[in-house]
Amino acid sequence: MSESLSVKSAESSIIDISNLCLTFETQTEPVHALSGINMKVNSGDFVSLIGPSGCGKTTLLRVIADLEKPTSGTISVEGKSPHEARLNRSYGYVFQTPALLPWRNIESNIHLPLEMSGYSKVEQKNLSQQYLSLVGLSGFEKKYPWQLSGGMQQRVSIARALSFDPDMLLMDEPFGALDEITRDRLNEELLRLWEETQKTVVFVTHSIPEAVFLSNKIVVMSARPGKIINVIETNFPK
């Protein structure tokens, strides 16, 4: 397979990556994390990144999110640099663990990005209620993270990522630490959210069944240095 395979179609792309490489300098020798990545993601796509551990899936997601800087190549997110897209709040990011602030209740955790974006108190309350309802957690506004199960906490993280209405969700193995039953249920909920909101989603996973169930496109990466070795379009009914 050519390493220049890309996620593309005739539609305009919301993420456009060309010949991107990333090398980490260490005290011993350079670590080549990504090599020759070419990828286009269209608006409304649900794209899963899969591949062996250490292949650069999370690193690629972090480059899109402006959390890592590429060594060479180009990347645009909604026609802007990743830095500009981050400042413009073009995406919400969901981490492997919920990353909720334990001293804030659930409602207040969802308010955090809204506070930073200058939303009024009334807007914050209305939006937190709207997105808690969307993820099935109405009535839990005043609870604290420690009072919720792991799956419920991750649903709060998704609500927080959606609260300021970004065009994209970037998700780094958000259900990887959960038991299989909870994970399957949250996958069904995430698929429903995607169908309802039509957000663009880039989703990192180790699970082939999860990728097939959720995605309309699957990007397969090689072992390090990470390259795109295949792009699979899934046409199964959801």
What are the residue ranges of the model-derived segments?
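Helix-to-loop junction immediately C-terminal to a conserved catalytic motif
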Residues: 65
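Conserved ABC ATPase "signature" region
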Residues: 115, 122-140, 192
